[in-house]
Every structure is written in structure tokens, then in C-alpha cells.
């Protein structure tokens, strides 16, 4: 079976959003070539976070990024290309730079798609304790504290390579003490839910508005026995959810975090933590303001490239 590869030339900051658009339009998998990722690699075998990568083996760009979605060959390309172009262009409304937004199509054979792309994915140590491993890789932990998260990166919903995901994983590692009730909003690949379980969380509920993302999360959860009891469902943010969690996490765009803030406040226990990422530079003041207006206290803020992650808590004595 041949495939239609639709490539979008974009910016590094828009990689995850463009990946989502392609998957939402029917792509069966996504390949990313990001100049920022290549620039972060050390000379030699190991990457910035201990990943096993030979830089010379990676096709790379000098600037920007290219995201390729792989579609069944029978898709109607003349209709698909302008639709993708329009959706990528609208990313400006969310504070993201769509870059060149050049969209093109080519035919690739099954061998190219099914196996060749896998050689560019390798184990990636993203935090002090967490390493993301492609499901087909055989990998042994380097030390007793290293915990492995197995993912199928073919469906690119936050696979650990983007700064927003790394910021959130680092925040989880700082925050989880043990046995917390965690809600993962906009779960995507399920990576945050899996990480939470590895770090000692108790009950974990995960939600996403997108059915494709929910199915992707379920597949990844099944690869990780530690996360076998995580519940995943389709839901828009926390609409209709009425509970009291210890920790709520969300790696989503700032414009979507804004309506989530009051919902998170209502669904947290006093003293509960709210972890957010996916916040581009110029939106960080807005999120700080909205968190504080709601009554949250911001405990920590970290930045990676142009992205921010924040840890806030609900006061124990609510006015």
C-alpha cells in the first residue's frame, strides 16, 4: 500500500499544533524535522537529555520545521491541501507563528512509511527519573531510579520531545509525593498520566476532547502496565466534572487554559496543585493574571525556549 505524505513547512513553536491538525485531518502518523531539536544535540552520540542519537544520521533543517502527515493514498489531495493551509494559518489567533505554511504532497511506498521513519526515534531521558522509549526499542534502565515510559510516537500528541511536554514532566517530578488523585486535561498521548503513575500517583483520570487523541492515549497506556488503571474519556476540559483532586495537569494552549482555570479551582481540594504548560512567551502574563484573579498562588514558573510552565496551588483557607 502506498501513502500520501503531506508536508507542512512551519516554525518550531508550532510543531505540536501542526501535528495535531494533520492527525485530526486523518493522518495515520506524523514525522517531524525540527531545526531546534538538531541544534540542541551535543556533538557525538548523546543528546541534551541523554537520548541515543547520532546527529549525522538525522535529516535536519537549518531553520524552522517540517511536519509530514501520512495519509491513505485515496485522500482527495486538492481539497486537503488548502484546508490544512487554512487551519495552520489560523494558529496566529492562538499566538503561534505558522512559519512559511508551505503545504505540499508526495507519494511514498509502504516500506518508507512503515519502517524507515522508526530509525529516527530513540530512548529519550527527559527528566532525572523519566525516560521515554519507543515501543519497538529494547532498552534497559541506566540506573535504579530511571523509569521507562513506552510510547508509540507514530501519533504525535506530546511524545516528550517538545519543550511544553518536558516542562510538564519536570513539574510532575517536582510535585508528586505519592498517592495523589490526578486529573490530566487534554491528555493527548497519555504521557503525563503514565508519568504520574510512575512517580507514585494514586487515581488518575485523563480527558481529551478529541477521539483520535483518546484512542492514542489508550494504546500508549496499554504499553505501560504501571498505568493500567488510568481512566481515559472524551470530555471538553472539565465540563460536567465535579470532584476534588489533589493535582490537575494541562499541557494545552494558553487560550484554552484560560477557561480551564476556574474549572480547575473548583475541582481541586484546598492545597491542591494546578500544573500548566503550553504557554508561549507573550501569553505568560495573561496566564499569571488569570491564575491570581481566580485565587491561585503561583509557586514556580520555568521556561524552556519560548515556552513557560507554571505550578500553582489553591490556598488551604479559601476566602
Swiss-Prot record:
Binding site for S-adenosyl-L-methionine: 165, 186, 208, 251
Enzyme class at the top of the EC tree: transferase
One of the record's GO molecular function terms: protein-lysine N-methyltransferase activity
The keyword Methyltransferase belongs to this UniProt entry's keyword annotation: yes
InterPro entries: Ribosomal_L11_MeTrfase_PrmA, Ribosomal_PrmA_MeTrfase, SAM-dependent_MTases_sf
One Gene Ontology biological process: methylation
Keyword line: Cytoplasm, Methyltransferase, S-adenosyl-L-methionine, Transferase
Protein name, entry field: Ribosomal protein L11 methyltransferase
